[in-house]
Amino acid sequence: METIAKHRYARTSAQKARLVADLIRGKKVAAALEILTYTNKKAAALVKKVLESAIANAEHNDGADIDDLKVTKIFVDEGPSMKRVMPRAKGRADRILKRTSHITVVVSDR
């Protein structure tokens, strides 16, 4: 049974979050949680939270055994960017893009 968890509008760029997502794709959830715990990236904490939510969803909604679960799919899509302005010299301004992303984790017991 496939179970999904999402974190939409996560305040990290999709490019940075994909580096972390690639580490755990296809792994058993216990190994994936271990990897994320010791990965020194901001995105690792965000992905770990989504993975824990997917595990809880599988256990509560589908009655799945945690020991059999694997991360079958994990993908990170770009969310909307917040546009901000940074003042510069001589009355100019630069535009800053505060990027967001949508993190999706799918766990399955098959």
UniProtKB/Swiss-Prot annotation:
Task: Look up and give the organism this protein is from.
Answer: Mannheimia succiniciproducens (strain KCTC 0769BP / MBEL55E)
Q: What SUPFAM superfamilies does the record tag this protein with?
A: Ribosomal protein L22 (SSF54843)
Q: List, alphabetically, the GO terms of the cellular component aspect.
A: cytosolic large ribosomal subunit
One of its GO biological process terms is: translation
| Family, similarity comment | Belongs to the universal ribosomal protein uL22 family.
Molecular function (GO) terms for this protein are: rRNA binding; structural constituent of ribosome
Alphabetical UniProt keywords: Ribonucleoprotein, Ribosomal protein, RNA-binding, rRNA-binding
PANTHER family linked: CHLOROPLAST 50S RIBOSOMAL PROTEIN L22-RELATED, LARGE RIBOSOMAL SUBUNIT PROTEIN UL22M
> Which domain of life, per UniProt?
Bacteria
What name has this protein been given in UniProt?
Large ribosomal subunit protein uL22
Q: Which NCBIfam families match?
A: rplV_bact (TIGR01044)
Could you tell me what this protein does? This protein binds specifically to 23S rRNA; its binding is stimulated by other ribosomal proteins, e.g. L4, L17, and L20. It is important during the early stages of 50S assembly. It makes multiple contacts with different domains of the 23S rRNA in the assembled 50S subunit and ribosome.
Family annotation (Pfam families): Ribosomal_L22
- The gene from which this protein is expressed is rplV
* UniProt keyword Ribonucleoprotein, yes or no: yes
- What does the subunit comment say? Part of the 50S ribosomal subunit.
